[in-house]
From Swiss-Prot:
Domain of life, per lineage: Bacteria
Organism: Treponema pallidum (strain Nichols)
Lineage: Bacteria, Pseudomonadati, Spirochaetota, Spirochaetia, Spirochaetales
Entry protein name: Uncharacterized protein TP_0873
Length: 200
């Protein structure tokens, strides 16, 4: 078994590990001590599904594979938070286009915009699960609210937006997108961009 981390060959000594999963667990623990985390695993040059990874983790150490690991540092996570927040801030201005697209019969583009917006929010939330390596306070408040408060507020708005889209109610879509969802996401994104995270 060969392992590379961020393109560099890893020289490692097996201690008590018997499976690939145990070795990767030890690598992740070592990364956490250095304020890093494994963010991607490719095996023999390809990404595996969750089921394939589970199978791989159970395999013995004499399995003939090449594992390529990519890590994120705390600085990477903080930079990613800023990047996603900047993108979300720009996309909030485009939320009003969802209703316009519906009026012009371009429902597919409206759904694509909501899907993209949701994916960005999911990535943002995931970054906060890495608060340990990013040295972010677990009790972090953004513009006076905890992250989970924003999540609780945003989730039903997205659901309501999708329901209004399915019903073809462009007035409700416009109201939810422009007057309810956009301001909350704008506050969250702007608050993150103004946090002192040690990166510019």
């Amino acid at each position: 078994m060969d392992i590379t981390i961020n393109g560099h060959t890893l020289q490692y000594v097996i201690e008590h590990e018997k499976t690939i999963g145990e070795v990767l667990g030890a690598i992740e623990a070592a990364c956490k001590k250095e304020k890093q985390t494994v963010s991607a695993v490719t095996v023999n040059g390809r990404e595996l599904s969750a089921n394939e990874l589970d199978t791989l983790f159970c395999q013995s150490l004499d399995t003939d594979v090449t594992l390529n690991l990519t890590t994120l540092s705390g600085g990477d996570v903080r930079a990613l938070l800023r990047e996603i927040s900047t993108t979300l801030l720009a996309r909030t201005a485009a939320l009003q286009e969802i209703a316009v697209n519906m009026h012009s019969g371009n429902l597919a583009e409206s759904y694509a915009m909501v899907s993209d917006f949701s994916a960005l929010l999911k990535s943002l939330y995931h970054c906060f699960t890495l608060s340990d390596i990013a040295d972010l306070d677990h009790g972090l408040r953004i513009k006076g609210k905890a992250l989970h408060d924003y999540q609780r507020e945003i989730s039903p708005l997205l659901k309501g937006l999708l329901e209004a889209m399915e019903e073809g109610d462009s007035v409700a879509v416009g109201d939810i997108a422009e007057y309810e969802l956009a301001p909350v996401v704008r506050d969250l994104s702007d608050g993150i961009l103004h946090m002192d995270m040690g990166v510019q």
